Amino acid sequence: MIKKTILLILCVALIAGLVGAGCSSAPPPVPLTEPIPQRANLVASIQINEILTDEDLIEAYDEAEKDPDMPETIEEAMQEIEDEIGIDPRDFYEAVVFSDTECEDGYWGAIITGTFDEEELIENIEQEIGEELTSINYHGYKRYADEAGENGLCFFSDDTFLIGTLDAVEDSLDVAAGDAMPLEGPVVDAYEALGDVWVRVAVKLPPESMEDLTGDEIPVESETLERVEALGASLKKVGQNVSLEIRICLTSPVLAEALKVILIGVKTYFQLTADLPAEAVDVMKKIVLSRSGSCTVIMLTATVYEIEDLVEAIQEEED
């Protein structure tokens, strides 16, 4: 139930962001300061409090169609989550998440900042899992774990804690203690370039996953996809203005420029020949393609009225 509610909230957050789109300038880079281990191939950050207290998001969630068992309002959703885990999600400011997406057994961690009571948080977790957490001294940190040794928890400070699979938690603590090097390279570069935004994510995808993303409609050679070092995406909202950015980072500026030219051609082709509603064509015209270093950059700018018209047109097509 809670997972379903959270997923709906995140979906509405993205929709609300796109609905208000109107800013095309990229934000300045923001460095990654959290202890992210080298094993990770994905890094993401979410400004939790900003999203959950945004008036447009609240309105979008409250008006969205929901299943009968879903909370009617975002206030009800927050209360249900607090009743079950003992914490109001709006008390969390930011979550920086990392993972190894290719690990079949699961490898992930989340560094969360906010206002919370350490003892109360531990009690709530123990009550939720039905067992007591054990703790050891790990690099001077008190590292908690469940009985199976699968998941871990550690408090960096009064307002920051680390939670995740035990191996990911310990790897992060190794980095924090200076016993291991942090994640570096294209994924971090792409993540930092996305700047201070609502949501930002950067990931290294295998070529087969890139092929799934592009599909048959986008004529990009497999050799080019093999040279994609990182894929980044971000969403930022300021007032009624939101920017959506996608960065495809390759091994050289030449490849990035070539991919930009291909995508411009694809955009033009769809605008002229695809059987799309006029509203969709209008939004496609708002897509701006450029190159920044070795990255092909896609920016989308649209007004609330254009997106509303597009949503209505899509609904009419489905009917």
Q: Where are these predicted regions, by residue range?
A:
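Secretory targeting signatures
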Residues: M1-P27
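Short amphipathic alpha-helical linker/capping segments at the junctions of internal repeats
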Residues: A176-V188, G265-Q271, Q315-D319
